[in-house]
């Protein structure tokens, strides 16, 4: 059994770690609330854009935009949204597992895969496992801006415009609630038809001003940017929630470990006192 002094040192070490994890839990909770507000503010715009695009995809368009046309799939692109920091449980690894499974399905069909990465965890992961990375951005912090994402988005859109990509997906965690975050793979190109039954029951015709091409070129690009930005914001909210839960679990585990070490310390202390008393009694008997 370890000595009482050594056990006391371990208890102090765990207590110091527990203070750190408790502070990180509180910081993550504060950041999560702020990110939830940002996510709630941007979600109506993203959902409205998705609804409008759903109408367009099912409508009788005067001008058929390339983003609305299905084509033979020879190469697909994934814009992968991960975190810049760790200590958020299995958030990133669960996302990567889902992505790798989807990539394997395409690879089994002989389809090539390109990757544009957001977040240092995705960059380090694919540097380890391999993959055709065509663009990346890291260090966006807790207040991501759309301008930070323009680089990877432009790379993928240019590849699609030039016919080097036939499908484009955004891969990110969807924020369900504080305790649940779900990895999602969202197809953004070609634009999927709306799955709302109300959309399918109605025929939508449009009058375009100034002209269909100019309007659709602008609108569809705004749509893609909104979906990518919303995915980044939701992934950030998921990160803070997962980190808060992970740090709470670490703090609770630290408390349990301290209790166990305290019991061991008490036993060691009791054994030490018993031994000292035995030595005193033995010495007195010898005299």
Curated annotation (Swiss-Prot):
InterPro entries attached to this UniProt entry: ATP_synth_F1_ATPase_gsu, ATP_synth_F1_gsu, ATP_synth_F1_gsu_CS
Keyword Cytoplasm in record: no
Purpose of the protein: Produces ATP from ADP in the presence of a proton gradient across the membrane. The gamma chain is believed to be important in regulating ATPase activity and the flow of protons through the CF(0) complex.
Main localization, broad class: membrane
Pfam families xrefs: ATP-synt
Coiled coil: none
Family of the protein in this entry: Belongs to the ATPase gamma chain family.
GO cellular component, as recorded: plasma membrane; proton-transporting ATP synthase complex
Compartment(s) where it occurs, according to its Swiss-Prot or TrEMBL record: Cell inner membrane
Assembly notes: F-type ATPases have 2 components, CF(1) - the catalytic core - and CF(0) - the membrane proton channel. CF(1) has five subunits: alpha(3), beta(3), gamma(1), delta(1), epsilon(1). CF(0) has three main subunits: a, b and c.
Protein name as catalogued: ATP synthase gamma chain
A GO BP annotation: proton motive force-driven plasma membrane ATP synthesis
Membrane topology designation: Peripheral membrane protein
Species: Proteus mirabilis (strain HI4320)
Keyword match ATP-binding: no
PANTHER family reported for this sequence: ATP SYNTHASE GAMMA CHAIN, ATP SYNTHASE SUBUNIT GAMMA, MITOCHONDRIAL
Molecular function GO labels: ATP binding; proton-transporting ATP synthase activity, rotational mechanism
Disulfide bonds: none
Keywords for the protein's UniProt record, in alphabetical order: ATP synthesis, Cell inner membrane, Cell membrane, CF(1), Hydrogen ion transport, Ion transport, Membrane, Transport
């Amino acid at each position: 059994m370890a000595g009482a002094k050594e056990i006391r040192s371990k208890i102090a070490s765990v207590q110091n770690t527990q203070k750190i994890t408790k502070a990180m839990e509180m910081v993550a909770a504060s950041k999560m609330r702020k990110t939830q507000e940002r996510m709630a503010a941007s979600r109506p715009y993203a959902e409205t854009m998705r609804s409008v695009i759903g109408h367009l995809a099912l409508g009788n368009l005067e001008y058929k935009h390339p983003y609305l046309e299905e084509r033979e799939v020879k190469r697909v692109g994934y814009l992968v949204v991960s975190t810049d920091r760790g200590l958020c449980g299995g958030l990133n690894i669960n996302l990567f597992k889902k992505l790798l499974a989807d990539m394997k399905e395409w690879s089994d069909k002989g389809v090539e895969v390109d990757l544009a990465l957001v977040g240092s965890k995705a960059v380090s992961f694919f540097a380890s496992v391999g993959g055709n990375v065509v663009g990346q951005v890291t260090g966006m912090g807790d207040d991501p801006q759309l301008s930070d994402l323009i680089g990877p988005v432009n790379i993928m859109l240019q590849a699609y415009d030039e016919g080097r990509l036939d499908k484009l997906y955004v891969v990110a965690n969807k924020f369900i609630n504080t305790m649940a975050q779900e990895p999602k793979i969202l197809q953004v190109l070609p634009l999927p038809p709306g799955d709302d039954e109300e959309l399918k029951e109605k025929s939508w015709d449009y009058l375009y001003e100034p002209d269909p091409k100019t309007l659709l070129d602008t609108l569809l690009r705004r749509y893609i940017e909104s979906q990518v930005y919303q995915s980044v914001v939701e992934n950030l909210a998921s990160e803070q929630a997962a980190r808060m839960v992970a740090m709470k679990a670490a703090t609770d585990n630290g408390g349990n470990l301290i209790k166990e070490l305290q019991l061991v310390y008490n036993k060691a202390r009791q054994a030490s006192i018993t031994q000292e008393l035995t030595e005193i009694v033995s010495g007195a008997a010898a005299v």
